C-alpha cells in the first residue's frame, strides 16, 4: 500500500488516509450571521464523498470582530452550532474526519467599525488602522478561543486547528513587524508566543482531541519571521500539546511569494526535523506521485490539499489511480467508480 493511503493517527483520531482538505475561506454566509449554509454542506461533504481523509473547515471566527469579512463562518455564539453539527454528520457519513479552523483576523478584518491588533499598525495604506488590544482584551480573545473550542466539541468535530498564519491576529503577535508591544506580549520571541501558548492551553481545558496549528514559516519580508524563528516556536507548541503543524507561508505583508509545485514543502520538512514534531505539507500539491514522494522521503506526515480540491473533489480517487491503488467508493457512486 502507498503511504498516502495508509492510516494516520492524530492523538486518538485515526484518519483513513493522509489527504487533508486545507481550510479555505468561501465568503458564503449570505446572512452575515456566521451560520453555515446549504452551500457549506454541499461544498465540504462533496470532498468527503470524494475520499478525503480529513476535511478542515475554513477560518471560523471566535469573535464577531475577528471575522475576515462579514461573510465568514463563526463560532462566537451557540446559535452557530446546529448547522455545523449537521455538516459534521455529513462528513462522518462518508468516512472523513471533521476539523475546524478557529481564527481571529485582527488587523486584516474588513468589517464596518473598529478592528483590533497587537499594535496600531495598518496592513497597508488602503486598510483601516486597528486599535491596539489591551491586556484585558487579549485575555478575552483567549477566552473566546476556549468558548469556540467547546462549541466545536458540541458540534462533533474531531480535530481543531488554530490559525496562527497568513497575517491574522496570532501571526500578528508572533511577528516583530506587526508586534511593537512593550509589555509581556511583545519584544522577545517568548513574549510574542505568549498569546498562542495561552490559547492552546485554554483550548485544552475544554478539548481533549488533537490540536493542529497553522503557521506561516516565513513573512517574505525584511525584519519579519524566517524559517529559523519557527523551530523554537514549534518546539514550544509541541511542549504545549500540539499534535501537528500545518506549514504555510506569507500573508503578513502585501507581497507575492515565489510559487511553484511544492514550494512550501521544504518549510514543513525543516520544521519537522528541527523541532521533532509532525507536519502537514501544502503548496501546489496536485498529483498522487508528488504527494507520495513527500511522505516516503519523510518530508511531512500529512498532505494538505487546497486549490486542487476546489478543482477536483475526487482528488483522492484520482491520486489513488495514479498510485495503482483502489479506494472504496461511496455506495451511491460505485457503478461509475472505476
Curated annotation (Swiss-Prot):
<feature type="binding site">
    <location>
        <begin position="22"/>
        <end position="25"/>
    </location>
    <ligand>
        <name>FMN</name>
    </ligand>
</feature>
<dbReference type="GO" id="GO:0009636">
    <property type="term" value="P:response to toxic substance"/>
</dbReference>
<comment type="subunit">
    <text>Homotetramer.</text>
</comment>
<keyword id="KW-0560">Oxidoreductase</keyword>
<dbReference type="GO" id="GO:0050661">
    <property type="term" value="F:NADP binding"/>
</dbReference>
<feature type="binding site">
    <location>
        <position position="27"/>
    </location>
    <ligand>
        <name>substrate</name>
    </ligand>
</feature>
<feature type="binding site">
    <location>
        <position position="101"/>
    </location>
    <ligand>
        <name>FMN</name>
    </ligand>
</feature>
<feature type="binding site">
    <location>
        <position position="214"/>
    </location>
    <ligand>
        <name>FMN</name>
    </ligand>
</feature>
<dbReference type="InterPro" id="IPR023663">
    <property type="entry name" value="NADPH_DH_bac"/>
</dbReference>
<dbReference type="InterPro" id="IPR013785">
    <property type="entry name" value="Aldolase_TIM"/>
</dbReference>
<keyword id="KW-0285">Flavoprotein</keyword>
<feature type="binding site">
    <location>
        <position position="59"/>
    </location>
    <ligand>
        <name>FMN</name>
    </ligand>
</feature>
<feature type="binding site">
    <location>
        <begin position="306"/>
        <end position="307"/>
    </location>
    <ligand>
        <name>FMN</name>
    </ligand>
</feature>
<comment type="function">
    <text>Catalyzes the reduction of the double bond of an array of alpha,beta-unsaturated aldehydes and ketones. It also reduces the nitro group of nitroester and nitroaromatic compounds. It could have a role in detoxification processes.</text>
</comment>
<feature type="binding site">
    <location>
        <begin position="163"/>
        <end position="166"/>
    </location>
    <ligand>
        <name>substrate</name>
    </ligand>
</feature>
<dbReference type="GO" id="GO:0003959">
    <property type="term" value="F:NADPH dehydrogenase activity"/>
</dbReference>
<dbReference type="InterPro" id="IPR044152">
    <property type="entry name" value="YqjM-like"/>
</dbReference>
<protein>
    <recommendedName>
        <fullName>NADPH dehydrogenase</fullName>
        <ecNumber>1.6.99.1</ecNumber>
    </recommendedName>
</protein>
<dbReference type="GO" id="GO:0010181">
    <property type="term" value="F:FMN binding"/>
</dbReference>
<dbReference type="Pfam" id="PF00724">
    <property type="entry name" value="Oxidored_FMN"/>
</dbReference>
<keyword id="KW-0521">NADP</keyword>
<keyword id="KW-0216">Detoxification</keyword>
<dbReference type="InterPro" id="IPR001155">
    <property type="entry name" value="OxRdtase_FMN_N"/>
</dbReference>
<keyword id="KW-0288">FMN</keyword>
<comment type="similarity">
    <text>Belongs to the NADH:flavin oxidoreductase/NADH oxidase family. NamA subfamily.</text>
</comment>
Amino acid at each position: 500500500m502507498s503511504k498516502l493511503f495508509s492510516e494516520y493517527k492524530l492523538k486518538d483520531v485515526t484518519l483513513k488516509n493522509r489527504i487533508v482538505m486545507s481550510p479555505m475561506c468561501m465568503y458564503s454566509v449570505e446572512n452575515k450571521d456566521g451560520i453555515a449554509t446549504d452551500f457549506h454542506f454541499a461544498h465540504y461533504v462533496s470532498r468527503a464523498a470524494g475520499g478525503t481523509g480529513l476535511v478542515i473547515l475554513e477560518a471560523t471566527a471566535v469573535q464577531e470582530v475577528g471575522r475576515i469579512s462579514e461573510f465568514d463562518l463563526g463560532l462566537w455564539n451557540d446559535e452557530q452550532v446546529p448547522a455545523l453539527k449537521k455538516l459534521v454528520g455529513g462528513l462522518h457519513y462518508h468516512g472523513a474526519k471533521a476539523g475546524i479552523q478557529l481564527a481571529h483576523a485582527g488587523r486584516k478584518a474588513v468589517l464596518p467599525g473598529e478592528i483590533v491588533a497587537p499594535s496600531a499598525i495598518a496592513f497597508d495604506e488602503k486598510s483601516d488602522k486597528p486599535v491596539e488590544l489591551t491586556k484585558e482584551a487579549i485575555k478575552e480573545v483567549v477566552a473566546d478561543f476556549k468558548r469556540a473550542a467547546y462549541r466545536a466539541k458540541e458540534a462533533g468535530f474531531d480535530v481543531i486547528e488554530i490559525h496562527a498564519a497568513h497575517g491574522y491576529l496570532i501571526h500578528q503577535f508572533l511577528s516583530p513587524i506587526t508586534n511593537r508591544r512593550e509589555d509581556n506580549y511583545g519584544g522577545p520571541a517568548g513574549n510574542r508566543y505568549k498569546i498562542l501558548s495561552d490559547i492552546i492551553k485554554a483550548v485544552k481545558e475544554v478539548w481533549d482531541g488533537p490540536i493542529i496549528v497553522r503557521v506561516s514559516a516565513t513573512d517574505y519580508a525584511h525584519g519579519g519571521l524566517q524559517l529559523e524563528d519557527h523551530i523554537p516556536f514549534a518546539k514550544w507548541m509541541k511542549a504545549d500539546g500540539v499534535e501537528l503543524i500545518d506549514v504555510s507561508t506569507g500573508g503578513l505583508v502585501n507581497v507575492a511569494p515565489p510559487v511553484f509545485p511544492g514550494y512550501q514543502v521544504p518549510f514543513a520538512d525543516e520544521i519537522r526535523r528541527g523541532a521533532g514534531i509532525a507536519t502537514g505539507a501544502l503548496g501546489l500539491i496536485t498529483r498522487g506521485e508528488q504527494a507520495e514522494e513527500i511522505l516516503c522521503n519523510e518530508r511531512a506526515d500529512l498532505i494538505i490539499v487546497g486549490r486542487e480540491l476546489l478543482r477536483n473533489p475526487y482528488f483522492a480517487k484520482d491520486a489513488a489511480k495514479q498510485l495503482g491503488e483502489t479506494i472504496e467508493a461511496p455506495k451511491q457512486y460505485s457503478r461509475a467508480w472505476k
